Amino acid sequence: MTSATQFDNVSVVKRANVYFDGKCVSHTVLFPDGTRKTLGVILPCALNFGTDAPELMEVQAGKCRVKLAGSSEWQTYGAGESFSVPGNSRFDIEVLDTLDYVCSYL
């Protein structure tokens, strides 16, 4: 069962995904149906990420600004909000307050 605060009956990869000299750290969660998510934290900074698969980023805590590839506008997101990123794309993120997030690979 999945609730708003936890994921049940999953496996977690013990090894952390560490990016950008430790500014972004996450762990991969594997679901029985074969889907996966990452749960992570990004420290205040400005980064550029690339995507392979489409992603849904759900902000659990913190605040960030995001600019998707091909866009000239920044959008601000906080706790309880989410944004989608196309596959085979890039996005800029400026983390204003330490970001706690869940990333779903669609």
UniProtKB/Swiss-Prot annotation:
* EC number annotated for this UniProt entry: 2.4.2.1, 2.4.2.2
What protein family is recorded? Belongs to the nucleoside phosphorylase PpnP family.
Which InterPro entries does the annotation name?
Ppnp, RmlC-like_jellyroll, RmlC_Cupin_sf
> What does the UniProt record say this protein does?
Catalyzes the phosphorolysis of diverse nucleosides, yielding D-ribose 1-phosphate and the respective free bases. Can use uridine, adenosine, guanosine, cytidine, thymidine, inosine and xanthosine as substrates. Also catalyzes the reverse reactions.
| A Pfam family the protein falls into | Ppnp
Q: Name one GO cellular component term.
A: cytosol
**Protein name as it appears in the record:** Pyrimidine/purine nucleoside phosphorylase
What's in the keyword line of the UniProt record? Glycosyltransferase, Transferase
Q: Recall the GO molecular function terms of this protein's record.
A: guanosine phosphorylase activity; purine-nucleoside phosphorylase activity; thymidine phosphorylase activity; uridine phosphorylase activity
Q: Which reaction is recorded as catalysed by this protein?
A: a purine D-ribonucleoside + phosphate = a purine nucleobase + alpha-D-ribose 1-phosphate; adenosine + phosphate = alpha-D-ribose 1-phosphate + adenine; cytidine + phosphate = cytosine + alpha-D-ribose 1-phosphate; guanosine + phosphate = alpha-D-ribose 1-phosphate + guanine
PANTHER family named among the record's database cross-references: PYRIMIDINE/PURINE NUCLEOSIDE PHOSPHORYLASE, PYRIMIDINE_PURINE NUCLEOSIDE PHOSPHORYLASE
